[in-house]
From Swiss-Prot:
It catalyses: heme b + 2 H(+) = protoporphyrin IX + Fe(2+). PANTHER family: FERROCHELATASE, FERROCHELATASE, MITOCHONDRIAL. Keywords: Cytoplasm, Heme biosynthesis, Iron, Lyase, Metal-binding, Porphyrin biosynthesis. GO terms for molecular function: ferrochelatase activity; metal ion binding. It holds the Pfam family Ferrochelatase. Belongs to the ferrochelatase family. Fe cation binds at H186, E264. It is found in: Cytoplasm. The keyword Cytoplasm applies. This is Ferrochelatase. It comes from Chlamydia caviae (strain ATCC VR-813 / DSM 19441 / 03DC25 / GPIC). Its EC number is 4.98.1.1. The lineage of its organism: Bacteria, Pseudomonadati, Chlamydiota, Chlamydiia, Chlamydiales. It comes from the Bacteria.
Amino acid sequence: MVSAYLLANFGGPRHSNDIEVFLTSLLTDRDVTGGFLPSFIHKRLFSFIAKKRALKVLPQYNCIGGFSPIYQDTELLAETLSSHLDAPVITFHRYLPDTHPHTIQQLKTLGDFPIVGVPLFPHFTYAVTGSIVRFIHNQLPLLNISWVSHFGNHPEFISCMMDHILKFLQSHDISTHDCCLLFSAHGLPMRHVNKGDPYNMQCEKSFRAISERLPNIETHLCYQSKFGPGKWLSPSTKDLCATLKTDKKHVLIVPFGFTSDHIETLYEIEKEYIAVLIDKGYQALRVPAIYQSSQWVESLATIIQSTPHVEKKSLIKS
């Protein structure tokens, strides 16, 4: 019997003072940025990049209220989910390092009782879910924990996404025959894909499963948030918005793989990509992340309880 669940998310700045700390924690993570540099050089280089980038994104955070809602949304989700699972739900915010000691202490108190880790990412990548698993394993190597590695093709996720999209269309009086949906997932460098990361295959499979159940709607899969040099998964959301040609009047961008809204949905999609589509003459809107769905908590509980749990060794890239 599971004694507790670990609900893991990206984390995000709770206020402006968190921005540089958050970015430093993110960019110095070698599962994310990789590289062949010695550890101390890698850390110094990406700490410098994080400091510069923090200045660039500060106005973007100010534009969405000065913080990311992902931290609070994850905390509230854990509270609600606990009653559905009838067990404690502990939160882990990967790139908010000041929250880690409390999480580690909570996990330590569970001793050898079984725990299930639940990264809130539908599609697995070593750069995100793998990083979460590695961190927890490094901190608590003897922890009795198994993981929900991905759920992007789970019937409950597909059903919840469809319900969420169709309710949004209905609430905005948009016909399924007159809209085009851009499913925007987070991008990934091709160097990860070429080394066997299954992320893009899972995204494509999940996208097809949803599209097949929406036969009257034009759909496209794209990838956003490219950072740094090198080739990434394509097409990019930015390029697709710029080149899109459709006879549909309404174009909606659906956060795909983002279960919570944050800077990449509230600013990148809302303020940048939607503006491009509007300039092209479309009536464009951003669909909120699935967190806003009334069905989400119940669906997630079902996913957690019905998905085979995976041991850590298969989730960490050597």
